[in-house]
């Protein structure tokens, strides 16, 4: 499945919630009708079956983290092999992706921009360049912006935006040095309550 390159607001309207695909910190529901699906018949919201609800939740989470279907299924399989709650394990794996950590630290305005920074070799982990967006960051890893990339205006703009967002407690960031420490794997209480991972587990358990 190819990566979606169309309008970002359309995806948020499809899922009925802000997927944080745009760089602004203001909720996008002020500029588009999130409760109304895109398209000519978007106002007619059909009642979803249990399967439909589960599928929509999976699509929502997959789009939030910018992960393709096959990748997402592989994350789920890995989550089932780990000890503990499968749904929480899934979210932990997604949060540990390098592109997501770069976004959470504020070096990229969106996850898509952060993914591009990683692929363009602008990010280092423990002093070594890593250009794989799905690289799993471990506790105590140091993630930093490469020296020659620090002058990029988009990084400075992203850091300014990040100042307006709630700071993740599982990260320690030095905005001046443009580096941060992944102190620990986030707990479920640290993450968005708008995600219902249990629906995803139910979907894949069938």
UniProtKB/Swiss-Prot annotation:
Pfam families attached to this UniProt entry: Ribosomal_S4, S4
Keywords, in A-Z order: Ribonucleoprotein, Ribosomal protein, RNA-binding, rRNA-binding
Record function comment: One of the primary rRNA binding proteins, it binds directly to 16S rRNA where it nucleates assembly of the body of the 30S subunit.
Xref: InterPro entries: Ribosomal_uS4, Ribosomal_uS4_bac-type, Ribosomal_uS4_CS, Ribosomal_uS4_N, S4_RNA-bd, S4_RNA-bd_sf
Cited PROSITE patterns: RIBOSOMAL_S4, S4
Family: Belongs to the universal ribosomal protein uS4 family.
Gene giving rise to this polypeptide: rpsD
Organism of origin: Photorhabdus laumondii subsp. laumondii (strain DSM 15139 / CIP 105565 / TT01) (Photorhabdus luminescens subsp. laumondii)
One cellular-component annotation, GO: small ribosomal subunit
Superkingdom to which the source organism belongs: Bacteria
Gene Ontology BP annotations: ribosomal small subunit biogenesis; translation
SUPFAM superfamilies listed in its UniProt record: Alpha-L RNA-binding motif
Subunit structure of this chain's protein: Part of the 30S ribosomal subunit. Contacts protein S5. The interaction surface between S4 and S5 is involved in control of translational fidelity.
S4 RNA-binding domain segment(s): 96-156
Protein name in UniProt: Small ribosomal subunit protein uS4
């Amino acid at each position: 499945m190819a990566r979606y390159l169309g309008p970002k607001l359309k995806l948020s309207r499809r899922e009925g919630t802000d997927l944080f695909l745009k760089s602004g910190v203001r909720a996008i529901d002020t500029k588009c009708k999130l409760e109304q699906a895109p398209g000519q018949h978007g106002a007619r919201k059909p009642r979803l079956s249990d399967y439909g609800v589960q599928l929509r939740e999976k699509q929502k989470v997959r789009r939030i983290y910018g992960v393709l279907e096959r990748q997402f299924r592989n994350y789920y399989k890995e989550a089932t092999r780990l000890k503990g709650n499968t749904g929480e394990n899934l979210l932990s794996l997604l949060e540990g992706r390098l592109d997501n950590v770069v976004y959470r630290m504020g070096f990229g305005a969106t996850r898509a921009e952060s993914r591009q920074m990683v692929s363009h070799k602008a990010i280092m982990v423990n002093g070594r360049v890593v250009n794989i967006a799905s690289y799993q960051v471990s506790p105590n890893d140091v993630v930093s912006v490469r020296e020659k990339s620090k002058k990029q205006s988009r990084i400075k703009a992203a850091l300014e935006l990040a100042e307006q967002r709630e700071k993740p407690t599982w990260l320690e960031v030095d905005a001046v040095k443009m580096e941060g420490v992944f102190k620990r794997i986030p707990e479920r209480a640290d993450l968005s309550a708008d995600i219902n991972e249990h629906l995803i587990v139910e979907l894949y358990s069938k």
